[in-house]
Amino acid sequence: MVLAVEVIVCCLIFGIYRVIRIKRDPAYKISNMPEKLQKKVMHMRGYRNRNIRIMTDWEKFVKKLPTLIFWTIALVILTSIAGAKSFSTGFVFALLIWMAVLLFLELVVYCGWYAHTPKVWIKGTEDMAKKTYTNYAHYIGLIPQRALMGIVVAIIAVSYTHLRAHETSLH
């Protein structure tokens, strides 16, 4: 029951956070959008001074590193609260939370809300909607890569929790 509440709360918190960030700054997730859109935005008058450029995969990873560290810490706490007693249970709990939030963001927030809310799109790019904003394959195509990141984060989070459990039980 605790795990279900954690999943729901995490989905709501991260969903609301993403909606607020996108409403505040439509170019917030530009590095995750199709390259064609990134190129157009780079040359638009209002965005030239924002240092928007096409990032390499390594640069995208480095940009996401603080978020991954946050998630690792959060999953250590959440799996402990949910009552994970073994490495395998903790891993399943952590991965379940990660995947639930990932799927909620990609399918509900991006495919459901963002793809159908033109007023939050980058002004001047509406003509590219079919190939960018409403391209569900783009959003769904990001799921496997992010799921792999989730597996790594879950292993790190649960390894730490598991080591701490052994350390405290030995003393």
Predicted regions and their residues:
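Juxtamembrane non-transmembrane "cap" segments at the membrane-aqueous interface
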Residues: 110-128
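Hydrophobic alpha-helical membrane-embedded segments
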Residues: 8-28, 97-113
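Short membrane-interface loop/juxtamembrane segments of multi-pass integral membrane proteins
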Residues: 40-55, 125-140
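Long, highly hydrophobic alpha-helical transmembrane signal-anchor segments
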Residues: 1-7, 61-91
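Membrane-interface helix-loop junction between the first two transmembrane segments
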Residues: 20-44
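Alpha-helical transmembrane spans of integral membrane proteins, capturing the lipid-embedded, hydrophobic core
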Residues: 7, 11, 15, 64, ...
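Conserved small/polar residues in nucleotide/adenosyl-binding loops
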Residues: 161-168
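Loop-to-transmembrane boundary segments
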Residues: 52-65, 134-151
